[in-house]
Amino acid sequence: MNENLDPTTKGYNSEELDLEKRLRPLSFDDFAGQDQVLENLKVFVAAANQRGEALDHALFHGPPGLGKTTLANILANELEVGIKITSGPVLDKPGDLAGLLTNLDERDVLFIDEIHRLSPIVEEYLYSAMEDFKIDIMIESGPNARTVQINLNPFTLIGATTRSGLLTAPMRARFGISSRLQYYSTELLTTIVERSAGILKMPIDLEAAIEIAGRSRGTPRIANALLRRVRDFAQIKGNGTIDLEISKYALKALNVDAHGLDEMDNKILLTIINKFKGGPVGLSTLATAVSESSETIEEVYEPFLIQEGFIMRTPRGREVTEKAYKHLGKINTNIQGGLF
């Protein structure tokens, strides 16, 4: 996937990250989509505020770029508390987690992205913090070592994951709130594109906003990334306004087709068709064939390809669908051969 369109923020420079933050909604009122999730969260937050308690621990899961981090920040804003942000792979040992937990004020939010990647020892250390707001800390070492129990301020842990199936049952059970985020419709993404263009002070036509939204893989983060790149083309190759013509020109230059598939998406489909006769093919074999990691294919590319009906998962591996053949202008010889 084009680095600028990757539905993670990896590869973003400081300016891109600053723009990303500027475009993020800061309150429930600014957040578009995920209506049922949002309505439930409003109730939970209002109740917690009314009681003066910490919000129950919450888990957000779903494909990348749908608003998990944004919702964590919104919850902290709506609760009027502080938030500390970290990620599973960063927390190598219990001491890393203890440093964060002991510095949380009452009702603060601790957000752990990629929580499914916590090491088992750190995860187990988190259990007592989540349940009893207590942790054990080892004092000194050697024969003088002893354990001291420390009381924590009541806090809210918000976990985000793209792979909820990798969470252990004990961890999943400790979240009182669990919400799955869904892909966005073109209509909602159009609203998001128009809002973001307004923040960037960039004139945009409705037709252009619809075009960008339709190629954004149902993902707000990608919609905003595409908008920023189209803005560059409008500024240098156009008249400063994002219209339909410059949008199509820019999206073609970015190798983003009418379905929102980019170069790697189409490479995955073509590889399954040309090298594996349409499939089935195992994930690791496919990853080697397209020179991409299995994890990236499974987390970033595959969910949308399955959602849009280009790929099927079967017990024997991945297979492309008839829609993929038509999209790429290929003939499915497997079907033809079965007719004679």
UniProtKB/Swiss-Prot annotation:
* Substrates-to-products reaction catalysed: ATP + H2O = ADP + phosphate + H(+)
User: Which positions are tagged coiled coil?
Assistant: none
Give one GO biological process term. Answer: DNA repair
Positions annotated to bind DNA: 313, 318
PANTHER family referenced in this protein's UniProt entry, alphabetically: HOLLIDAY JUNCTION BRANCH MIGRATION COMPLEX SUBUNIT RUVB, PTHR42848
| Statement: the UniProt record of this protein carries the keyword Transmembrane helix | no
Sites where the protein binds ATP: 23-24, 65, 68-70, 131-133, 174, 184, 221
The record, for Pfam families, names:
AAA_lid_4 (PF17864), RuvB_C (PF05491), RuvB_N (PF05496)
What InterPro entries does the record tag this protein with?
AAA+_ATPase (IPR003593), AAA_lid_4 (IPR041445), DNA_helicase_Holl-junc_RuvB (IPR004605), P-loop_NTPase (IPR027417), RuvB-like_N (IPR008824), RuvB_C (IPR008823), WH-like_DNA-bd_sf (IPR036388), WH_DNA-bd_sf (IPR036390)
UniProt record similarity statement: Belongs to the RuvB family.
The entry lists its GO molecular-function terms as: ATP binding; ATP hydrolysis activity; four-way junction DNA binding; four-way junction helicase activity
* Annotated compartments: Cytoplasm
Which keywords annotate this record?
Answer: ATP-binding, Cytoplasm, DNA damage, DNA recombination, DNA repair, DNA-binding, Hydrolase, Nucleotide-binding
Q: Can you tell me which residues bind Mg(2+)? A: 69
Say if the entry is tagged with keyword Hydrolase.
yes
Name the segments for region: Large ATPase domain (RuvB-L).
Answer: 1-184
Physiological role: The RuvA-RuvB-RuvC complex processes Holliday junction (HJ) DNA during genetic recombination and DNA repair, while the RuvA-RuvB complex plays an important role in the rescue of blocked DNA replication forks via replication fork reversal (RFR). RuvA specifically binds to HJ cruciform DNA, conferring on it an open structure. The RuvB hexamer acts as an ATP-dependent pump, pulling dsDNA into and through the RuvAB complex. RuvB forms 2 homohexamers on either side of HJ DNA bound by 1 or 2 RuvA tetramers; 4 subunits per hexamer contact DNA at a time.
The organism of origin for this protein:
Flavobacterium johnsoniae (strain ATCC 17061 / DSM 2064 / JCM 8514 / BCRC 14874 / CCUG 350202 / NBRC 14942 / NCIMB 11054 / UW101) (Cytophaga johnsonae)
Task: Provide the residue span(s) of the region labelled Head domain (RuvB-H).
Answer: 258-340
Q: Show the GO cellular component annotation of the record.
A: cytoplasm; Holliday junction resolvase complex
Q: What is its EC number?
A: 3.6.4.-
Quaternary structure per UniProt? Homohexamer. Forms an RuvA(8)-RuvB(12)-Holliday junction (HJ) complex. HJ DNA is sandwiched between 2 RuvA tetramers; dsDNA enters through RuvA and exits via RuvB. An RuvB hexamer assembles on each DNA strand where it exits the tetramer. Each RuvB hexamer is contacted by two RuvA subunits (via domain III) on 2 adjacent RuvB subunits; this complex drives branch migration. In the full resolvosome a probable DNA-RuvA(4)-RuvB(12)-RuvC(2) complex forms which resolves the HJ.
From the Swiss-Prot or TrEMBL record, give the protein name: Holliday junction branch migration complex subunit RuvB
